[in-house]
Each structure stands twice: as C-alpha cells, then as structure tokens.
C-alpha cells in the first residue's frame, strides 16, 4: 500500500513508470477502447467509490494524464501552425501594400512629368483620331467634288478646233482647245455657221443612202480645201506634241521665266533697246529746239 500511495502522491513522475508513453505517441487499440469505456461509465452515472489507491484507478489516472499530455502537444502544434499561417498572411499583405504604394508613386511621377510637358497621351491619341477622320472626310468631299467639275459641259468655256494641213503631200491634223471668247474660236464658229448655211437645204435623198451631217460633213469640207503647212510650222507642232507627251510643259515654262531662261533674256534685251531708243529720241528733240 505504501508503494501505491507514493505513486499516487504529488511526487509521482510519469517518466519513471513502465507504461509511460512520450508526448505525441499514438495510443494502442486497447488503451483507446478502455478510455472510451471509462467515459461511458462516467456518463452513465456514479459508481461505487473504491479506494483511491487501487491499482486500477492508478492506471486510469496514468492514462488520462498521458492523454492530456498528448492533447496539449497537439494544441501547441496547431497553435504554432496557425501562427505560421498568420505570419505568412501578414507578409503577403505587407508585400501587396508595398507594391500598391510603389505603383501610386510611379503614377504620381508620370502625372507630374505629363503636366510639365503639357501633353497627355490620351488627348493626343484622340486628337490624332479626330484629325484622321477629318482628313478622310475632306478626301471624300474632294472625290465627290471632282466628278461634279468634270460633269460641266465642255462648250461652257472651251472650244475644240480641228484643222487639217497638207505637209509634203501628207495630211496633218491639228487639234487644240481655246477659249470660246478668243478670236480664233469666234472665227471658227462663224466659219462653221457659214458652211452649215451654205449647205443645200433640201436635196433628194436615196433610200438606203445616208447623207453625211454634222462634224463629219464639216471635216469633209475642210479636207477638200487643205491648207499648206510650212516646215517651221511643222517643227513647232512637233515640238508642242513632244512637250505634251513628255509632260515637261510646266517645267519649261518655269525655266523660261527664270533669270537664265531665253524668254527672260529676250525681254531684258527688248527693254534695254526701248530705253536706248527713248534716250536717243530725247537727245534729238533737245537739239531741234532753238
């Protein structure tokens, strides 16, 4: 009895017991079944009290104590795991907050840079899109306006004149457009009216034979009376045709209007001759006076 009392006393050490199980060790199936049975008995009702120092009660106390130690160890491990998870969450949150602060700083720097420059990328992009749309609208309007200009009647301000010449037995046709108010156009129109009026009003027509009329008849009359063309006129005509084919009419006109152009030199010499003539005339008039 004295041995049992010593084991149940306050100086009892579980490490000295033969049935001692270290903390964290698993229970055997027998221990678990016995513990469950004890819990059921305690829940069923009070049992007759036995001696506190009985060996059965001592073993029960040992097992309960071991179970309490295991539960404490599990709770400590769970608490440590929870603390580790909380620390990881805090680290992630702090990193996220730091990234947001850096992003805000970058945005502030970029906004200050744009305010110093005085331009905003979005505004510039919108202006570019508006400019592109305006250019497209203008180009469409131009394309729509060009056909209207081409639809104007040809005889509103220009007259096409076709002349037939005879150069060394060869028929040469010259076609050009002139203003309707020019002398050449007026004379051509008068001549055309004269030929139309001189044509017989009523000639007997034969069935199946069509009488030539309009421009074809006029060209036939012009062809019957071909004008002679000189070599100088033929060379001038060839030169004009060559300029039109090569597309150098405007370039030659600009060059001739320059200081080194032939026309400008010719005009300068004419002005000098005219000025010299005026000086000589003034001298003669001054001598003739008494």
UniProtKB/Swiss-Prot annotation:
Localization in the cell: Chromosome, Centromere, Kinetochore
Composition-biased stretches (Acidic residues): 1-20, 27-43
Compositional bias annotation for Basic residues: 58-68
Cellular component annotations (GO), alphabetically ordered: kinetochore; Swr1 complex
Annotated keywords: Centromere, Chromosome, Developmental protein, Kinetochore
GO biological process: chromatin remodeling
Basic and acidic residues bias locations: 91-108, 146-157, 175-193
Low complexity bias spans: 120-129, 213-222
Signal sequence extent: none
Region (Hydrophilic): 159-208
Xref: PANTHER family: CRANIOFACIAL DEVELOPMENT PROTEIN 1
Function text: May play a role during embryogenesis.
Protein name from the UniProt record: Craniofacial development protein 1
Source organism per UniProt: Gallus gallus
């Amino acid at each position: 009895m004295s041995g049992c009392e010593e084991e149940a006393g306050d100086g009892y050490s579980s490490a000295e017991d033969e049935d001692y199980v270290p903390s964290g060790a698993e229970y055997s199936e027998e221990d678990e079944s016995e513990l469950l049975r004890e819990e059921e008995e305690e829940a069923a009702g009070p049992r007759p009290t036995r001696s506190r120092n009985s060996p059965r009660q001592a073993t029960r106390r040992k097992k309960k104590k071991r179970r309490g130690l295991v539960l404490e160890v599990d709770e400590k491990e769970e608490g440590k795991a929870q603390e580790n998870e909380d620390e990881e969450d805090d680290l992630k949150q702090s990193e996220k907050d730091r990234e947001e602060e850096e992003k805000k700083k970058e945005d502030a720097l970029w906004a200050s840079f744009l305010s110093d420059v005085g331009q905003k990328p979005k505004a510039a992009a919108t202006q570019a899109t508006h400019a592109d749309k305006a250019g497209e609208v203008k180009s469409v309007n131009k394309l729509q306006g060009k056909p209207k200009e081409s639809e104007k009647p040809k005889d509103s301000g220009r007259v096409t004149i076709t002349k037939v010449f005879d150069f060394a037995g060869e028929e040469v046709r010259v076609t050009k457009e002139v203003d309707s108010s020019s002398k050449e156009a007026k004379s051509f129109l008068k001549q055309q009216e004269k030929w139309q009026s001189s044509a017989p009003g009523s000639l007997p027509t034969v069935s199946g034979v069509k009488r030539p009329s309009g421009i074809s008849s006029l060209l036939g009359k012009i062809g019957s009376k071909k004008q002679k063309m000189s070599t100088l006129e033929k060379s001038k005509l060839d030169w004009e045709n060559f300029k039109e084919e090569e597309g150098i009419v405007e370039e030659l006109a600009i060059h001739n209007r320059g200081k080194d152009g032939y026309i400008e030199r010719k005009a300068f010499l004419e002005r000098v001759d005219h000025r010299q003539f005026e000086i000589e005339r003034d001298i003669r008039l001054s001598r003739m006076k008494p």
